[in-house]
Amino acid sequence: MGGLPTLRIEPVPLERKVRPGDDLAELIAESAELEEGDVLAIAHTVVSKAEGALISLDEIEPSPFAKTLAERTGKDPRVVEVILREAESIVRVGPDFIITEVRGGMVCANAGVDESNAPPGYVIVLPEDPDRSARELRRRLRELVGVDVGVIITDTQGRPFREGVVGVAIGASGVPVLADRRGDRDLYGRELKITIVALGDLLASAAELVMGQADEGTPAVIFRGLKPELERFEGPRKARAIIRSPSRDIFR
């Protein structure tokens, strides 16, 4: 992508665990020195916690259909019931997963319902509107520290035909999530015809290397030095733009 700038990725360990109702921007501002042009990548789990998107399994009564799916997938029937409530539709069911479409059109495993990093007896669900959450976090950070930063909300997803999970951007504000390279030239002068780079997902995956997936306790990172590169692109600034339309989805 041309002459790449020097890039730094700095972890942002928060001072304490996030609780429902917390001002997440305030916690971040207390834990990190933000600069103009930084990009903040933050795990959706802490965004969801701050927004109160925690569900107590003790309050869930599984439906007969949830119990049937639980038998097929080996999952807790209460977790399956939460998945069904969060999903717009079911795409596929496997021996240990339920592939779903959720609000906004994103296709993911188990409707994004997360048991990891949730308090015992609870599950975390996705933010109601991750792009809106990113936009509000960006606005609040600008209000608190007086600098404009990009924000990406991350999750991890599997991919068809590939083992393992990678980071993806499920919410964004102030960052081009797609870089259209069509019309650029390769090393031999040939015009690129179809290359569109998923910048949001690339940043989310890089962030996951620093955040970790277990008990590392680093729910956010700062990218510093990206501003000159990102200013080259005029792509969409919402993560929803990364979602492929059903008419172009060859896997359903």
UniProtKB/Swiss-Prot annotation:
A divalent metal cation 1 binds at D114, D155. Catalyzes the GTP-dependent successive addition of two or more gamma-linked L-glutamates to the L-lactyl phosphodiester of 7,8-didemethyl-8-hydroxy-5-deazariboflavin (F420-0) to form coenzyme F420-0-glutamyl-glutamate (F420-2) or polyglutamated F420 derivatives. It holds the Pfam family F420_ligase. Binds 2 divalent metal cations per subunit. The ions could be magnesium and/or manganese. Monovalent cation. The ion could be potassium. Gene3D superfamilies: CofE-like, CofE-like domain. This is Coenzyme F420:L-glutamate ligase. It comes from Methanopyrus kandleri (strain AV19 / DSM 6324 / JCM 9639 / NBRC 100938). A divalent metal cation 2 binds at T156, Q213. The keyword Signal does not apply. Belongs to the CofE family.
